[in-house]
C-alpha cells in the first residue's frame, strides 16, 4: 500500500511540475493585433517571452550580461527536448534582433517564430537543433521610442532609435567592444558557438522591387570547405527555396543616385566591426537580412 501511495505522490509531483499546454491565442503579438502596423515595446517583448517560457518546456528566456542602458541582454532559446546547454553535437543557430531598433522587423518575426515553435505550429522534432535569439540587442535604443527618426521608412507606427544608450552605433562596435552590449554579445556568442548566425536589419535608401535581400559574409574569408559550402550550397538553396514564395530574395545592393559599374554591383565588405564580419572570424556562417524600408511593414516582417 505504501508503495502505491509513493508512486501516486511522485506522479502528482511530476504533473504539478509540468508547464501548462500553450494556447497560441494567448500569445498574439502587437504586430498581429495591429494588423501589421505596430511593433512591440521593450516591456511587451520581455513580458511576451517570460510568459512563453512559463508556458512551454521547450522555451527558455535568460538574462545574459549587461548593456549600456543598465538593463540586461535577454536570450530566448528553443530546443525540442528542452536541452539548452549548447554542445558540439548540436546544430546551432543564433539570431540577432534590434541592433538598430528602428529596424524592428526581426523583433516581431522572432516573436511569432518562437511562439509557433512552442505551440508546434512549426513542428521540429530534432533534439540536436538549438535555436537562440537575442530578443533586442540595443536595449537603450528600444527604450528611446519615437516616430520620426526613420521618416522615409514605411512603418511601424513607432519604433526605437538607432543609437544605444550612449549613442553608439552597435553595428560598428563588435571587434572594438567599447560598449557593454558588445561585450555581452561576445559572451552570448562564445557560449553558444553557433554554426549559423543571422542579423536582422532594414535598408536605408536604395530603391528596388524586392521586399527582402540578403548579405552573406564573403565566402572567401572563410576556411576553404566552409566558404565553398556558403557560396555553392547555402546561398543558392536559400534563393531557390524562396524563389517560388511570395517574397523572393536577392543579394543586397546599396547605391544612391548613380549608375552601377558595368561589371556589376560591388559586394558590401563586412569587416569585423560588423556582426557577420565578427562571427566569421570564428568560422560561423553569417547572413545579414535587409528588408526594404519603402515596402509595407507587414510584408517586411512576414518575409523575415
Give, region by region, the residue ranges found by the protein language model.
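Bacterial Sec-dependent N-terminal signal peptides
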Residues: 1-26
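Structured catalytic-domain cores with a bias toward divalent-metal coordination
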Residues: 17-304
Amino acid at each position: 500500500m505504501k508503495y502505491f501511495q509513493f508512486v501516486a505522490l511522485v506522479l502528482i509531483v511530476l504533473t504539478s511540475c509540468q508547464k501548462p499546454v500553450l494556447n497560441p491565442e494567448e500569445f498574439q503579438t502587437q504586430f498581429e493585433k495591429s494588423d501589421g502596423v505596430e511593433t512591440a515595446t521593450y516591456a511587451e517583448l520581455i513580458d511576451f517571452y517570460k510568459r512563453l517560457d512559463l508556458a512551454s518546456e521547450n522555451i527558455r528566456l535568460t538574462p545574459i550580461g549587461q548593456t549600456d542602458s543598465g538593463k540586461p541582454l535577454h536570450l530566448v532559446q528553443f530546443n525540442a527536448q528542452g536541452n539548452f546547454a549548447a554542445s558540439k553535437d548540436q546544430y546551432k543557430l543564433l539570431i540577432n534582433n534590434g541592433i538598430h531598433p528602428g529596424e524592428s522587423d526581426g523583433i516581431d518575426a522572432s516573436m511569432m517564430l518562437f511562439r509557433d515553435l512552442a505551440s508546434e505550429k512549426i513542428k521540429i522534432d530534432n533534439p540536436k537543433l538549438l535555436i537562440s535569439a537575442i530578443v533586442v540587442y540595443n536595449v537603450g535604443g528600444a527604450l528611446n521610442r519615437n516616430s520620426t527618426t526613420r521618416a522615409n521608412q514605411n512603418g511601424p507606427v513607432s519604433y526605437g532609435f538607432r543609437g544605444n544608450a550612449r549613442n553608439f552605433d552597435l553595428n560598428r562596435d563588435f571587434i572594438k567592444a567599447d560598449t557593454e552590449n558588445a561585450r555581452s554579445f561576445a559572451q552570448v556568442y562564445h557560449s553558444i558557438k553557433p554554426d549559423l548566425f543571422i542579423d536582422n536589419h532594414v535598408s536605408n535608401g536604395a530603391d528596388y522591387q524586392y521586399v527582402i535581400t540578403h548579405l552573406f559574409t564573403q565566402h572567401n574569408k572563410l576556411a576553404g570547405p566552409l566558404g565553398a559550402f556558403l557560396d555553392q550550397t547555402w546561398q543558392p538553396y536559400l534563393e531557390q527555396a524562396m524563389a517560388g514564395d511570395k517574397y523572393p530574395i536577392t543579394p543586397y545592393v546599396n547605391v544612391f543616385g548613380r549608375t552601377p559599374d558595368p561589371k556589376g554591383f560591388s559586394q558590401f565588405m563586412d569587416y569585423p566591426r560588423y556582426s557577420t564580419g565578427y562571427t566569421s572570424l570564428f568560422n560561423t556562417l553569417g547572413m545579414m537580412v535587409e528588408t526594404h524600408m519603402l515596402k509595407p511593414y507587414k510584408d517586411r516582417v512576414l518575409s523575415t
